[in-house]
Curated annotation (Swiss-Prot):
Organism lineage: Eukaryota, Fungi, Dikarya, Ascomycota, Taphrinomycotina
UniProt-listed PANTHER family: TRANSCRIPTIONAL REGULATORY PROTEIN RXT2
GO cellular component: cytosol; nucleus; Rpd3L complex; Rpd3L-Expanded complex
Gene (UniProt): rtx2
Protein name: Transcriptional regulatory protein rxt2
Entry similarity comment: Belongs to the RXT2 family.
Role, per record: Component of the RPD3C(L) histone deacetylase complex (HDAC) responsible for the deacetylation of lysine residues on the N-terminal part of the core histones (H2A, H2B, H3 and H4). Histone deacetylation gives a tag for epigenetic repression and plays an important role in transcriptional regulation, cell cycle progression and developmental events.
Length: 240
């Protein structure tokens, strides 16, 4: 009981001690990260992503009230009228928000839209479908071994000789327990195959739909034959 009370007392002392306590005489100073400096004073207030440092921010931060929140702005882009302004100084210079967020005006734009075309150009669905097929094939081999073992345990294999009159292997009780275990493993394996088969079928269905969309945007019908889009369709307008 006394040892338990002493432990509680140590916990209380730890709660009320200086949170910045350190066995080092030096401070972390102007460092913006405490990596390798965790034993120095002030290291607790420094972490990756923190603006400034523990001894006082060296960066001028402007605070603005936006709605019910207070936002801090570390830096502002210089105006283009500034003679020292250079486009490559802007990290977002190569990003065209208007082009990325623009809607599709006609089906052909799907193949060149910067934000949407990559979804149809990449072959991740085919890779996932191939991976699912490999998993199903490997599980089929495992299921075949379990079925062979089950046939041997049940004595249904005509190629095997009859059971001996004397028991040289496992006991009948052990054989029954092993049969139940193999049966449960076989059922789980078949359920695993069914689930992965459904996943692969959904992936293949998604691939077919994707190819149909691409074919339509390329001016082809679902069978690959070239079709002529009406003027309204090519302009992105519905037919009247």
């Amino acid at each position: 009981m006394k040892q338990f009370e002493e432990q509680i007392e140590r916990f209380k002392q730890a709660l009320f001690e200086d949170s910045d306590a350190s066995d080092s005489d030096s401070s972390i100073g102007e460092a913006l990260t405490n990596r390798g400096l965790k034993r120095k004073k002030g290291s607790k207030n420094v972490y990756y992503g923190c603006v400034g440092n523990s001894s006082g921010s060296s960066i001028d931060i402007d605070y603005y009230n936006i709605g019910n929140t207070k936002r801090g702005v570390v830096s502002h882009f210089r105006r283009r009228i500034d003679p020292e302004w250079l486009d490559h100084d802007n990290p977002y210079n190569d990003i065209n928000i208007a082009e990325i967020m623009s809607p599709l005006t006609k089906p052909q734009d799907l193949l060149t839209h910067p934000a949407i075309s990559s979804i149809f150009e990449q072959n991740y669905l085919s890779i996932l479908a191939s991976s699912a097929l490999e998993i199903i094939s490997a599980e089929h081999k495992y299921t075949a071994h379990l079925e062979q073992l089950m046939v041997a345990l049940l004595g249904d294999d005509p190629s095997l000789p009859g059971p001996p009159h004397e028991v040289f292997g496992i006991s009948p009780e052990q054989c029954r327990e092993l049969t139940i275990t193999v049966q449960e493993a076989l059922e789980k394996s078949k359920e695993f195959i069914r689930c992965w088969t459904n996943v692969r079928m959904d992936l293949l269905r998604a691939i077919r739909f994707k190819n149909k969309v691409i074919a339509y945007c390329q001016g082809e019908d679902y069978n690959g034959n070239t079709q002529v889009l009406s003027k309204n369709e090519s302009d992105g307008k519905p037919n009247s």
